[in-house]
Amino acid sequence: MRLLSDLDIAKKKVGLRLDLNVPIKEGVVADDTRILASLETLNYLIKAEAKIVILSHLGRPKEGTFDDQLSLRPVVSHLSNELGISISLINSMKEFHDTNAQICMLENIRFFEGESKNSDSLAREIGAHIDVYVFDAFGTSHRKQASTYGAIKVAPFSCAGFLVQR
């Protein structure tokens, strides 16, 4: 797999798969170790003025069903505070395709039908609407799912982020 530092990602739309599966207690991130581990890659992309769409999962929701207890909303809030910038939470693939935000996060990828089965259609939904797919979800690298495997094959370019590179 190529490395992030090998690609020109300046001003490109980047899909960034992270492992932000962190414990949430009373709506607040209880342990931000995984969030902090993602900052090197995120800061690199921000400095390059890439348009970043973050993908991650939280827990094990019933696929295709929204569960407010497993929403990434607290993660977005915590990450926004860490970076000192606003991050919007988007809830649909249409928003994923259409977004022009500097940085946003797609709601829990496991809410989307086809993630765990490595659905070709979900992988295409992810990979076809970005310029570069950066995989930096070391904790999920063993899973053959749409966002951890399929999208890498579909995206025009894909590479490892700094956490996976290490």
Spans of model-derived segments:
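Active-site loop-to-helix "anion-binding N-cap" substructures in soluble metabolic enzymes
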Residues: M1-R166
